[in-house]
Amino acid sequence: MSQDIAKKIIGSEEWCSFPELGIPAIKARVDSGAKTSSIHAVNIQTFQRDGEEWVSFEVHPLRIDRRTVVRCQRPVIDKRIIKNSSGNSETRFVIRTPLKLNKKVWDIELTLSNRDAMGFRMLLGREAMMDRLIIDPALQCALGEVSKESLGKAYTKEETRKGGLKIGILACNESLYGNQRLLEAGRERGHEMLFLDIKQCYLKLDTLEPEVHYKGRLLNDLDAVLTKIGSNITPYATALSRQFESMGIYTCNSSSAISQSGDKLFSLQLLLKSGINIPITGFANSPIDASDLIEMVGGAPLIIKLLEGGQGQGPILAKTKNAAESLINTFKFLRANLLVQQFIKEANGKILRCLVINGKVVASIERTAASGELSSNTHQDGKSSIVKITPEERSLALKAAKVLGLQIASVDIINSKAGPLLLEVNSSPELEGIEIATGKDIAGMVISSIEKKLQWKRPLPQQS
């Protein structure tokens, strides 16, 4: 009984610190259901020091703040297979370091893991609390809060490391999740990241000195450009990408690849020519052809897609022939180009999305449309979950990206009775749904792919 009284009562979340890691404050989720403790770590690299294996890593201790970085080094005491929140097993490095909580200090073991998709940068498990702490789930920060002012004094924003690349993100809306993640991921790795609003870029056509300007500044010193666009502005964005190429600047997806994938009709024709199966699809330029067009794809129900659709816009399920004719005539009256496509009933509204980077499928999710909706893009309230793909699906995704010449692409696949069918290939993958569903640092993988193409290597920590 006296031993229980000596234990400290803590809440479901608490502020703590790691003096030897240089982390003065980090909020932890307290979970007795988890055996091990874990801390958010990125850019994890091992190295040798005095004949022992060490690990260097970076911690973003504050939630929703990637500019605050603490760089750490500790000896590796173990490597363990841990099951993550998605139910997948992964191998993690284990370190031992002193934890400070309410003026008490003791050593705990921490696994290093990317916790970007989690609500907390740290998880305090039961092994670290054994014989010391008691949890009251009704409490939060029972040992005291840390103010924003205190955090501001404790941490300083780090400047970009010298020797990194200069990378431009060519897009329209800087505040979008994917653009923010790419900017943050690049800065984490020591690169100078620039957001380039497509509408504020202009170019100079010249045989000897081609140029691109942005807000009056000449962009001739970029190492790489990553173009993230919607299909409605593909022509101008493609022209800008082509101009960067003529200046000798590396573009992650070439202008020709962006152009091909941005034209849905042309891309489907190219994919079919390469032997890739798609749902039966029709296209016409006149509403007079609506009835025959509907029969061409097997009749209603069928799918109607706007050629210029993006971020989940466009796909509509027409359940009857009359509804299909009405929709086709309406869109044609509005001079909107569209495709009609066979409806795959057995798919039950589920679409497989594979993310391809440099010839590898690095992540895959299954997207399910919200009730009453057809599009399952996460921008439209659809649900995403991690899924293991088959060799046939993997081969299809890789071939589709290769046919269109894309180094970075999302490939949408639908499963039919005849096997997997390709729906669409996008040169500007939406990152939010796939990062949240998989817990993977997809933005970091994209930046890493640029580093590999340009043969840039991250400086290793100095060995003593």
UniProtKB/Swiss-Prot annotation:
The record's keywords, sorted A to Z, are: ATP-binding, Ligase, Magnesium, Manganese, Metal-binding, Nucleotide-binding, Protein biosynthesis
In this chain, ATP is annotated as bound at: K305, Q342, F343, S376, N377
Record-annotated ATP-grasp domain positions: 268-451
Any one GO BP annotation for this protein = translation
- The molecule here is called Probable alpha-L-glutamate ligase
- Cofactor binding description: Binds 2 magnesium or manganese ions per subunit.
Specify the enzyme's EC class, one word.
ligase
A Pfam family for this UniProt protein? Rimk_N
- The entry's Mg(2+) 2-binding residues are E424, N426
- Region Unknown, as annotated, extends over 1-164
Gene symbol here is rimK
Residues involved in Mn(2+) 1 binding: D412, E424
